[in-house]
A protein has these predicted regions:
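Bacterial Sec-dependent N-terminal signal peptides
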Residues: 1-31
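Proline-enriched interdomain boundary motifs that mark the N-terminal boundary
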Residues: 191-196, 483-490
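Short edge beta-strand/loop segments characteristic of extracellular beta-sandwich folds
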Residues: 242-246, 432-436, 502-510
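Long, low-complexity serine/threonine/glycine- and acidic-rich segments characteristic of extracellular
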Residues: 115, 145, 187, 202-208, ...
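Proteolytic processing hotspots in large secreted/extracellular or virion-associated proteins
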Residues: 360-363, 368-374, 400-447, 491
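Surface-exposed, glycine-biased beta-strand/turn segments
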Residues: 21-104, 111-116, 131-133, 137-140, ...
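Short, solvent-exposed loop/linker segments at the N-terminal edge
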Residues: 225, 231-236, 423-425, 493-499
Length: 556
């Protein structure tokens, strides 16, 4: 195996940059003759690269596995197993292979690993005394060749159904790259679908839920779209556009994401978006790309065709004035949307816009509260509440608002409206709330919760409970005095388990969640596996446990 690996290295050094990808809008070129599909199934996807997810851009391709598990997963190319990961949610079970051509492939949600990998993982779990492990391997520790079976497909972790999540990453930068740009194409002759457009009246004001907006239905099919109600749009001032769009392939009915969107005015490109590659620290900035307030209010996904000043994503190859159009010359203009999937199938929509004449000094809304700047440290202080937001954690300037609401039953503080849920933040921020004096001995059990049920576990900090929420909203202090629950499934005191494969429990918590759990047999730590979806904790008997009477102890 190692001999073949060395020969392959030589071939790559000769050819990997001579055969380059030719495709849609992209800033880089990628080798085309190296990677194979990771499954021996006709390629069909349930999720596309870069498609819109709840709080991130999808980072790979989700290959379908006929709604079942157990298909062999193959190494996409020669390389070495560089990382193994087991986690409750996320990918569940994941394998990382580093290749000599500068890329790393990732295989997520697999059911089982090879026996050699299983042993390494088990040894690491016992070493760390943890079910969740994430560790790296030496380059010569576990070599693989293209096509080697490395796992069986599964449904582990935060997976909505059996499939294989597959990624190609830049080994050096760790950016994830669209796998279809490497020639791993999916049969696709279907152009994207456009269902509506959005029009935003910006006029120099920060983007928010108060930004005037309107949505217009779209009619058409097979790549040609128009407004459902034909009209010339009368627009004046600084305007941003958006649209609702999805894409399908020829082999799957799933509604996935598009690859690129280009906005032109009178033939001139003003804005371009393309899901070629991105860094993982940018993925939460999906909330700067979409109309986040509209999603929170109506669950409608609208992709904005203009860029917020604090946006962190590198998916905009080209833009003029951040895609914001000034309509103030009194002329009629053609506005064209050009939407493509990664296969190059194209859909277009053309609008006629009659421009008005904007006032020399368009009115700018006065802040309703404290003006926070997206590129500066922002702080707010009152006698009961403090907060601090680091630079870059907002996507635009913010007219921050704050209010004190009545104390809720069982709460140990008033409820504080920390702005509102319609404005996203990129990362956690610091929030301090002062509890009522009666909290006393319960201070170490205090947590900060929001009225929508989200939890920000707190800690005592100089008279305040400090937490780090990742959203704005209405927050208050509660105390968590109820211990987690443990419900035995197939075990009881004195039970005879000679014929059983293991012991099973259900565990849960009513507020702050499960932090740790520890299982012991006769005082020795044993590996307990937590199933994220079924909420079942299990210990599987193995040769380490001799027949006879044993004492099992579980601490949660």
């Amino acid at each position: 195996m190692s001999k073949k690996y060395i020969v392959t290295l030589f071939i790559i050094s000769c050819y990997c940059f001579n055969v380059l990808a030719q495709g849609p809008i992209q800033l880089h070129q990628y080798p085309q003759r190296f990677f194979r599909y990771p499954l021996d199934l006709p390629p069909s996807t349930a999720g596309s690269f870069g498609e819109l997810r709840g709080a991130h851009f999808h980072s790979g391709l989700d290959f379908k596995t006929n709604q079942t598990t157990g298909y062999p997963v193959h190494a996409a190319y020669d390389g070495y197993i560089s990382r193994l990961r087991v986690q409750f949610s996320g990918f569940g079970h994941a394998i990382y292979i580093t290749h000599p051509n500068g890329y790393t492939t990732v295989y997520g949600h697999v059911k089982t690993f090879t026996p050699a990998m299983e042993k390494l993982i088990r040894d690491e779990q016992y070493k760390q005394q943890s079910f969740e492990v994430d560790f790296k391997l030496d380059p010569l520790q576990m070599l693989v060749c293209q096509g080697d079976v490395i796992a069986m497909s599964g449904n582990e972790g935060a997976s909505a159904g059996p499939h294989l999540h597959f990624e190609i990453r830049d080994t050096q930068t760790e950016e994830t790259i669209n796998p279809q740009l490497f020639g791993l194409t999916i049969p696709d002759k279907v152009p994207p679908t456009i269902t509506s457009i959005g029009i935003y009246h910006l006029d120099g004001n920060p983007f928010s839920e108060k930004t005037p907006r309107q949505f217009l239905a779209v009619a058409g099919s097979n790549g040609s779209y128009r407004l459902a109600k034909p009209q010339i749009l009368n627009l004046t001032g600084q305007i941003g556009f958006g649209l609702s769009t999805t894409d399908m392939t020829s082999v799957s009915p799933n509604h996935n994401g598009i690859y690129s969107c280009e906005l032109k005015v009178d033939g001139k490109t003003m804005y371009t978006f393309a899901v070629e590659r991105f860094a993982f620290d940018q993925t939460h900035a999906i909330n700067a790309y979409i109309d986040y307030p509209e999603l929170m209010k109506t669950r409608r996904w609208v992709q904005k065709c203009f860029i917020l000043p604090g946006s962190k994503i590198s998916l905009y190859p080209q833009s003029i004035n951040r895609g914001i159009i000034d309509f103030n010359d009194g002329e009629v203009h053609d506005v064209d949307y050009v939407i493509k999937d990664v296969a190059g199938n194209t859909s277009t929509l053309t609008l006629k816009v009659k421009s008005g004449r904007a006032e020399a000094n368009a009115p700018v809304l006065k802040p309703a509260g404290n003006l926070f700047h997206y590129d500066k440290v922002n702080e707010f202080n009152s006698d009961k509440v403090k907060l601090q937001i680091k630079p870059g954690n907002l996507y635009d300037d913010l007219n921050f608002t704050y209010a004190v609401l009545p104390r809720r039953p069982g709460a140990f503080s008033a409820t504080y409206a920390i702005h509102n849920r319609f404005t996203p933040v990129h990362d956690n921020y610091d929030l301090w709330i002062k509890p009522v004096s009666s909290i006393g001995k319960f201070a170490d059990k205090a947590v900060i919760v929001s009225t929508d049920g989200a939890l920000a576990v707190g800690s005592w900090d100089n008279g305040y409970i400090k937490a780090q929420p990742h959203t704005f909203g209405d927050f208050f202090i509660k105390i968590d005095t109820v211990p987690p629950t443990i419900v035995p499934v197939n075990i009881k005191d004195g039970a005879n388990l000679a014929a059983a494969k293991g012991v099973y429990f259900r565990m849960g918590d009513n507020l702050s969640g499960i932090k740790t759990y520890t299982g012991k047999i006769d005082g020795k730590w044993v590996l307990m596996e937590w199933d994220f979806k079924t909420k079942v904790l299990r210990y599987s008997f193995n040769a380490d446990i001799a027949p006879g009477k044993h004492i099992f102890e579980l601490t949660v």
